[in-house]
């Protein structure tokens, strides 16, 4: 931050508005609506991932309009532009999922490109789904301008009328689990159809504490979005208010000289980790928070997640493992209630600056209601689990680390024998054909950031495993990822990945594997001399996808243990 007297609220746009040499630039800006009274106003990029492909982003165009109103009212000039977004729900379980995590980098790069080429002074960044949220936050951290993030909001839960006459509250995850149940003969095709027609009743991101809601909560916790803005559903009128206030806020940040890296610090990122732990959030938060830290040039490692998780209890009884959705969190006060509970317990840093220009502690003064309700969000002294919802494992199978969502892991210890599959499709076939049995450890490899490429999510197969009724008897381990909606015994982000020669590449059918959550261990119980002999003859399968954007990505992407960032 700088002293108010030294602040230029047009730190970059003077490059296109000032002087004889910028006659042509001003001429073009006149054509989009600017005039003589606008040249001294800061130019604010209003970037959104709006599209008509997925309900997650449908209301962003409307919200961008209100954000622009807020910019105008505060004395700035908004200039709207768009970026891409990939729907994980639609892309799941097939070739399209190779592009999901890749889209995070494309979003970041595209926002940087427009903001830098057009010399915009600050930004309101709007997003509504799993990769667009971290992509926008990464862009804010990289650019280090005055920036505000605004979430689209989540959808409401649907109600499916089942063939037995009952009604069932459903989210998108129920559709994936219904596939496995139908193939296992425990659900009729009629009921699957009823679920399909009900899981997405309208616009907004998936309603549970899946990746989009996890990252929206993290954005609020780190101070990059307005207090209370993560929880309201997409259809709620509060979204309009938050959009307008976000536009006003970015202009005020410029006036005060507050930039993204004044807010995105190691301490604020640890606050975000703490909130994710308390909510039982998505494993993808590990990747995304480390990637945001990388762009902010802040040190955040896998070890930090365990250190925070040791102290922060799991409080949120939220789907996919719990009973409630984000709209329920909204009803009892939203993310500020979680943050206040953690602050009062000394588990987050109240001195961190936020986009309001105030600290976390100042923002949380006088919130109403002030405390968790005890049901949707438990009190600190009555948690669901005494430690956080995510755990980092290490061991001979994952010397570089692996991630497990312990909020829903039903056993402290699992010992079984390997069933090895190179990529997801043959493993899915094995599930749907009833070929797995209790005690199997399904190894899905060559799905890492480089090996996929793209580190695909495994929601289709975890949903099928649960739907088939073997979710508590079969363990799934992969160098790929899991959806925030995945449930059951699943461990992802295994590093080093198979294509880098990690031990996961050496596993063979029948090998004994031991996972001990209490010891944070994941081990391949095969003698090192045997593994060395296997390594001598190791041959990686050919990958037909190493062209176009996937080819570029595979050359640049780093390990999952570093957030799968590209450089």
Swiss-Prot record:
Role according to the record: Functions in the biosynthesis of branched-chain amino acids. Catalyzes the dehydration of (2R,3R)-2,3-dihydroxy-3-methylpentanoate (2,3-dihydroxy-3-methylvalerate) into 2-oxo-3-methylpentanoate (2-oxo-3-methylvalerate) and of (2R)-2,3-dihydroxy-3-methylbutanoate (2,3-dihydroxyisovalerate) into 2-oxo-3-methylbutanoate (2-oxoisovalerate), the penultimate precursor to L-isoleucine and L-valine, respectively.
GO biological process: isoleucine biosynthetic process; L-valine biosynthetic process
Amino-acid positions noted as binding Mg(2+) in the UniProt annotation, renumbered to this chain: 88, 130-131, 457
Official protein name in the record: Dihydroxy-acid dehydratase 2
Keyword Hydrolase among UniProt keywords: no
GO molecular function, a single term: dihydroxy-acid dehydratase activity
Entry's cofactor comment: Binds 1 [2Fe-2S] cluster per subunit. This cluster acts as a Lewis acid cofactor.
Known catalytic reactions: (2R)-2,3-dihydroxy-3-methylbutanoate = 3-methyl-2-oxobutanoate + H2O; (2R,3R)-2,3-dihydroxy-3-methylpentanoate = (S)-3-methyl-2-oxopentanoate + H2O
Cofactor(s) the protein requires to work: [2Fe-2S] cluster; Mg(2+)
Positions where N6-carboxylysine occurs in the chain: 131
Sequence positions that bind [2Fe-2S] cluster: 56, 129, 206
Pathway assigned in UniProt: Amino-acid biosynthesis; L-isoleucine biosynthesis; L-isoleucine from 2-oxobutanoate: step 3/4; Amino-acid biosynthesis; L-valine biosynthesis; L-valine from pyruvate: step 3/4
Stated family: Belongs to the IlvD/Edd family.
Active site: 483
Enzyme class: lyase
Keywords, ordered alphabetically: 2Fe-2S, Amino-acid biosynthesis, Branched-chain amino acid biosynthesis, Iron, Iron-sulfur, Lyase, Magnesium, Metal-binding
UniProt keyword Metal-binding present: yes
EC number(s) from the headed UniProt entry: 4.2.1.9
Subunit structure: Homodimer.
Lineage: Bacteria, Bacillati, Actinomycetota, Actinomycetes, Mycobacteriales
């Amino acid at each position: 931050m700088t002293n108010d007297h030294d602040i230029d609220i047009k730190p970059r746009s003077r490059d296109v508005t000032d002087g004889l040499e910028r006659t042509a630039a001003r001429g073009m800006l006149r054509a989009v609506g600017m005039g003589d009274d606008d040249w001294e106003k800061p130019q604010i990029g209003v970037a959104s991932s709006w599209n008509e492909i997925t309900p997650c982003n449908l209301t962003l165009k409307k919200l961008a309009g209100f954000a622009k109103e807020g910019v105008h009212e505060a004395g700035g000039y908004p200039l709207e532009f768009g970026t891409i977004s990939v729907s994980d729900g639609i892309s799941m379980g097939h070739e399209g999922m190779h592009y999901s995590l890749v889209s995070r980098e494309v979003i970041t790069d595209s926002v940087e490109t427009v903001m830098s080429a057009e010399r915009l002074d600050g930004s309101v960044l709007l997003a509504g789904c799993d990769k667009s949220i971290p992509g926008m936050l990464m862009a804010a951290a990289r650019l280090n301008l005055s920036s505000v993030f605004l979430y689209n909001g989540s959808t409401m839960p649907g109600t499916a009328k089942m063939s037995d006459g009952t009604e069932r509250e459903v989210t998108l995850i129920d559709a994936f689990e219904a596939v496995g149940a139908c193939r296992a003969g425990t659900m009729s095709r009629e009921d699957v159809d009823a679920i399909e027609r009900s899981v997405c009743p309208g616009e907004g991101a998936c309603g549970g504490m899946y990746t989009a809601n996890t990252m929206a909560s993290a954005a609020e916790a780190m101070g990059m979005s307005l207090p209370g803005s993560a929880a309201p559903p997409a259809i709620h009128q509060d979204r309009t208010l938050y959009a307008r206030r976000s536009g006003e806020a970015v202009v005020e940040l410029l006036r005060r000289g507050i930039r993204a890296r004044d807010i995105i610090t190691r301490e604020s990122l640890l606050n975000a980790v703490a909130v994710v732990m308390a909510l039982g959030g998505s494993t993808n938060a590990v990747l995304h928070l480390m990637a945001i830290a990388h762009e902010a040039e802040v040190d955040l490692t896998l070890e930090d997640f365990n250190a925070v998780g040791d102290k922060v209890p799991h409080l949120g009884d939220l789907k996919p493992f719990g009973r409630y959705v984000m709209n329920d969190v909204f009803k009892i006060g939203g993310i500020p209630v979680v943050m206040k509970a953690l602050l009062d317990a000394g588990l987050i840093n109240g001195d961190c600056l936020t986009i309001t220009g105030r600290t976390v502690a100042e923002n949380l003064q006088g919130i109403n209601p002030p405390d968790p309700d005890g049901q949707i969000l438990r009190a600190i002294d009555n948690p669901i689990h005494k430690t956080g919802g995510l755990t980092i494992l290490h061991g001979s199978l994952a010397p570089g680390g692996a991630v497990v969502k312990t909020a829903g892991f039903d056993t402290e210890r699992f010992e079984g024998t390997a069933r090895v599959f190179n990529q997801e499709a043959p493993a899915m076939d094995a599930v749907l054909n009833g070929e797995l049995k209790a005690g199997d450890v399904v190894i899905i490899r060559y799905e890492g950031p480089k090996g996929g490429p793209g580190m695909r999510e495994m929601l289709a197969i975890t949903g099928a495993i649960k739907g088939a009724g073997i979710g508590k008897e079969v363990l799934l381990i992969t160098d790929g990822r899991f959806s925030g909606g995945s449930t059951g015994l699943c461990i992802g982000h295994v590093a080093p990945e198979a294509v880098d020669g990690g031990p996961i590449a050496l596993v063979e059918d029948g090998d004994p594997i031991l996972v001990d959550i209490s010891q944070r261990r994941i081990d391949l119980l095969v003698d090192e001399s045997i593994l060395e002999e296997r390594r001598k003859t190791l041959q990686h399968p050919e990958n037909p996808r190493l062209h176009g954007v996937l080819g570029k990505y595979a050359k640049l992407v780093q390990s999952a243990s570093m957030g799968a960032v590209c450089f």
